Amino acid sequence: NLARRLGEVIARFHGLDSARAEGLKTLISELQLASDERLREWVTKHYADLPSLPVAKCPVMVHHVPRFLSMRRSSGESKIALLVFDGLAVDQWVQIRQSLARRTPKLGFDESACFAWLPTLTSVSRQALFSGLKPREFADTIDTTSPEPNQWSRFWQDQGLRVNEVLYRKGIKRIDQLADLDAGLSEPLIK
């Protein structure tokens, strides 16, 4: 997984002191340019095949994520949470993951990456992510994120859950909001 490895390298680079980082700036920039070019070539050849690939091992595109989570529930996992960080680069996630691992060693991570729909617009990616639908299936609301709560709830109702067993929270930006989230996730009814 080139993106993950590159993210790890860039995160380590950003963790260096300025004197050590200065000597690597050009190399890191060249590495990023080369990986961008490789991705462009790969997308040109393979992107059209992605939407229809199977989801069994992990989601390939954002609209596969809900089905993948549903399969995990069907395999016996009683509670599943999906955390979405808008606009987060892989190297930024590496730093967050490392910090969380230090602070909460019992917390486990199940990480994978998937492709967004092109062009990568927030409203398209988020609606695909929460609904499990392809963009043409939500064309009427493609320019907004407001349908997300209903799409998330509808997806899980279609999988057999009741509306009061599904939780959706958006816009958690402050630490003081975490207590409310924790209370919601701790509800016995929430799946």
Where are these regions (language model features)?
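A short acidic-Thr-Gly-centered motif at the start of a beta-strand
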Residues: V60-K79
